[in-house]
Amino acid sequence: MPQLTERSAWAYKFEWTDDHLTPEQAEPLKHSYDVLAEECLNRLNAISPPQRGTLPRTSNTNPTPVRTEGTDAENKEIYPVPQRDLYALLKEHHTSDAKLDELWQQVNTIPDWVDWEQIERGQDVFYRYGGPALTGLTFQSLLGGMGAARVVETLARTGGFNTKVARRRLFETTQHILQCTRSLEGIKPGGEGHASSVRVRLLHAAVRQRILKLAETKPSYFNVKEWGIPVNDLDQIATIGTFSSSLIWLSFPRQGIFLSHQEIEDYLALWRYIAYILGTPDTFFTTTPKAKAIMESLFYNEVHPSEMSRTMANNIIISLKETPPTFVSADMLTASARWLNGNDLSDALGLKQISLYYWALMAGQCLFFAVYCYMNRLVPAWDRDHVRRAKVVFWDVIVKAKWGLANEETTFDFKYVPEYDTLTELGKHEERKVTRSAIESRNLRTFAIFAGASLVVLAAGTYASVKVASRILGTLW
């Protein structure tokens, strides 16, 4: 039996086992990466060179429109520059290049350990707890993940988390998650989630390649020796962990949601398969103990907030406050972050202090989610209907709605291009414009109902206890 040692990281306590990675054991993973994807990216760039002049997303996320020659009527029309689809290029040209075919065969080969029924159950887990899942992914996995100072250095150099574009980038990431979860066919080879995962894999290769090229001519731009290769294997493992393990053992429990053993195994199986498509070492997610151990190892070893961590975390709050569809205030967003990450980590990330009022709103939200999710889980028919409706609503809000991606699905092309002068800066907080959002009002009502019900139960219990005690004393005397 291995000797267990209790450790703590940011108010999270756990037992250190042989499955956990020490910093020394994790070090090689900082310098290894997806070589095959980068080799294929070079070939795809030769076949279809990326558009020149694609700049970092600092204020505008849309391709520059162009005019075409034609009739007077046609000349009045403005046509956007088409996005380059690396997945389509790979699909079209893999038969004419051995290296491209190697990648194509790899991503289209189903590992022996994949059980499609289990994968589908894992997809349903995401929607069964959809509200807490999106809350956890935003405020614990993403915002709290900004505490990993080493990883943040790569994100900061893309410019994709300044306040003007962070919200859209978050929606694009959510689009990928939804494509991987809203249907079983979508995650199978040729499906929308499968294709997007391949695109993201090649995008990671492009970011890595760009940063390393800049660092060659200006070593101070990115410290490879200290931070490792950009978008390395350890970073990729951490990313999969934030979408899976962190939800299971951090975000969900802190919102009063506890998955069954079967749900945990199913959800991990889904993300292990996504990791495989992304070119991420998936052996760390083969069992529940391993998946939990790698999350805890990275939480313990990697989360040490820097000044850039504070900038990125606060930019997420600024970019999301008072925006549709929720119109939630900055204080409510901060309450969500503090509830899910704890005060110690939140203080280290430079998040503002909030009043008890917003703590009460967050408590109300957790109560609402817990009751709603558990009630649906109790009745299979309700659960199926809830999952079905959640798939439609999430897609409509994130992808179709004008305040989301406006029905323009991203192909994960290389738009956050690192440059020497690209570094994410802290945005400015402005005065609140919306009095109170519907979400905040709902949370307040829920908290008030539960608080009132608790007082009634407490009063009734006290009254009953007094009556019983009186009768007992009466018989004794």
Language-model regions, residue ranges each:
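Mature, function-bearing regions of proteins
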Residues: 1-477
